[in-house]
Regions:
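C-terminal motif of bacterial Sec signal peptides marking the signal peptidase cleavage site
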Residues: 15-18
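Function-determining sites in protein domains
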Residues: 20-133
Length: 133
């Protein structure tokens, strides 16, 4: 009888843990900050991600701290299509995604492609529109 009650308690507790609602990936994001220059600005050469701040130190800045704003940006970033290998962005902006554990991800944004988590994606036009708003 004692073994049955222990097994029943283990079964019930494992059921509670299995039914616990999963947190959304956007729940661990504290803020998002855009730093950008004019998207149509032409230069004689491609601006690399690590050189963006030195070429455009006075860029415009937008901050998103409200959950609705953070969710809308993250939805755009999670539904992106991969770009062809070898494409690198001509960087016109950066997105800094700060997580609740103070780790910051950087997205390097070009008009055609962007670099996020060591992968190159096609830049969503909705993201460009959001940046320019």
């Amino acid at each position: 009888m004692k073994k049955i009650s222990i097994a029943l308690i283990l079964l019930i507790s494992s059921t509670f843990f299995a039914c616990k609602p999963k947190s959304k990936p956007t729940d661990d994001i504290k803020s998002i900050r855009f730093k950008f220059t004019e998207l149509g600005r032409e230069t004689q050469f491609r601006i690399a991600c690590d050189k963006f701040d030195s070429y455009f130190p006075e860029g415009r800045v937008k901050n998103f701290t409200q959950k609705a704003g953070v969710d809308s940006v993250m939805q755009l970033l999670t539904n992106m299509q991969r770009a062809e290998e070898g494409n690198l962005p001509d960087v016109r902006g950066k997105i800094y995604i700060t997580h609740t554990n103070s780790i910051t991800d950087t997205v390097c944004v070009g008009v055609k492609v962007l670099n996020y988590k060591d992968a190159v994606y096609q830049t969503p036009q909705e993201l460009l529109a959001l940046i320019q708003k």
